């Protein structure tokens, strides 16, 4: 799996961005978001049970990510047409406001997020800073959904530029990374 400190591999893919006829698809590239934080999440498959709970929670919290100057991109190894069909079929997904990307074989290999036996992407979360450096990467087993509030907490911590203790929350004291001289 890609690790913190790595440069995000450049990518270009197709995404489902709407269910409106004629506006369903768009090309999405890692270069489309200069100066922004990226929160990239992958899920195993469309037309499943845990995945929509995560997608909907990310979507409900888009404004919280935007307040942190972060763009959310989700997706799976299913293509953009599958994403569209699923969104049209699933009531909770019809009004999504963020893109669902096609994570093809090369992209999931480059990110190191391919499940070793199932032929799908892991439930991975990757946070990338405005310089294109991966600052956080985590993956859950296929059977356990992630916690979007924890993704926000980690993003907050990364954006402080300081050391953040276990269970730290935005607004709490950080540990200064600067050594202080004794007077």
Question: What are the residue ranges of the model-derived segments?
Answer:
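Chalcogenol-based redox active-site neighborhoods
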Residues: 1-183
């Amino acid at each position: 799996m890609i690790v913190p400190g790595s440069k995000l591999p450049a990518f270009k893919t197709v995404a489902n961005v709407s269910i409106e006829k004629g506006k369903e698809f768009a090309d999405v590239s890692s270069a489309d978001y200069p100066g922004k934080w990226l929160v990239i999440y992958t899920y195993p498959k469309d037309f499943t049970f845990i995945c929509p709970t995560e997608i909907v929670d990310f979507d409900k919290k888009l404004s919280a990510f935007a307040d942190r100057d972060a763009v959310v991109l989700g997706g799976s190894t299913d293509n953009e047409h599958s994403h569209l069909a699923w969104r049209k079929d699933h009531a909770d997904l019809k009004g999504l406001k963020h893109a669902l990307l096609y994570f093809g074989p090369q992209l999931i290999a480059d990110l190191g997020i391919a499940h070793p036996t199932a032929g799908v992407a892991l439930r991975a979360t990757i946070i990338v800073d405005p310089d294109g450096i991966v600052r956080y990467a985590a993956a859950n087993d296929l059977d356990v959904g992630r916690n979007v509030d924890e993704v926000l907490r980690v993003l907050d911590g990364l954006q402080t530029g300081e050391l953040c203790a276990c269970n730290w929350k935005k607004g709490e004291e950080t540990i200064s990374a600067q050594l202080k001289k004794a007077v």
